[in-house]
Amino acid sequence: MAVIYLAGGCFWGIQGYFDKLKGTLCSQVGYANSAVENPSYEFVCSGNSGAVEALELHYDEDLLPLREIIGRFLSVINPCALNFQGNDIGTQYRNGVYFVQESDESIIKECLKLWEKKHHKKAVTEVEKLQNFYSAELYHQKYLEKNALGYCHINTDLALQKWEE
């Protein structure tokens, strides 16, 4: 089992998308790389925590390789958007990939370079070692499963399509 942390705007959609993929073992949403211990949603939204809304994704590398995760992630967010995704604006909505295993860094950066070359654009996606992660409040967990009409900037049904690099 491997783990990666993905930030691409509101964490509801990122979780909704990746939870539909074969190879996802479990996930939870929360706040990554916060300057404050165990921040609340309200404090994160104030912009004073330094945290980013993120998905903690545990996955089976044989069924869902990291390259596919990063490729899919980049296909459902706007990697060129600085501090916003869709209608969500603020530093807590910046996009990034946060790794635990050092060996993941080169794979993530390679995938980003391939995306930039293919799209002729410069991504602003952060690629950093995870400093910390705090679980979000219970009402945020699996939000789109519990609230089918909840706002989301990501079409989570795209996860059902066959992946092609």
From Swiss-Prot:
Active site residues of this protein: C10
Superkingdom, natural source: Bacteria
EC number(s) from the headed UniProt entry: 1.8.4.11
Reaction(s) catalysed (UniProt annotation): L-methionyl-[protein] + [thioredoxin]-disulfide + H2O = L-methionyl-(S)-S-oxide-[protein] + [thioredoxin]-dithiol; [thioredoxin]-disulfide + L-methionine + H2O = L-methionine (S)-S-oxide + [thioredoxin]-dithiol
One function term, GO molecular function aspect: peptide-methionine (S)-S-oxide reductase activity
GO biological process: one example: cellular response to oxidative stress
Disulphide bridges, residue numbers: none
GO CC terms: cytoplasm
InterPro entries (alphabetical): Met_Sox_Rdtase_MsrA_dom (IPR002569), Met_Sox_Rdtase_MsrA_sf (IPR036509), MsrA_MetSO_reductase (IPR050162)
Enzyme class name: oxidoreductase
Keywords recorded for this protein, A-Z: Oxidoreductase
Role description: Has an important function as a repair enzyme for proteins that have been inactivated by oxidation. Catalyzes the reversible oxidation-reduction of methionine sulfoxide in proteins to methionine.
Family (UniProt): Belongs to the MsrA Met sulfoxide reductase family.
Protein's name in the database: Peptide methionine sulfoxide reductase MsrA
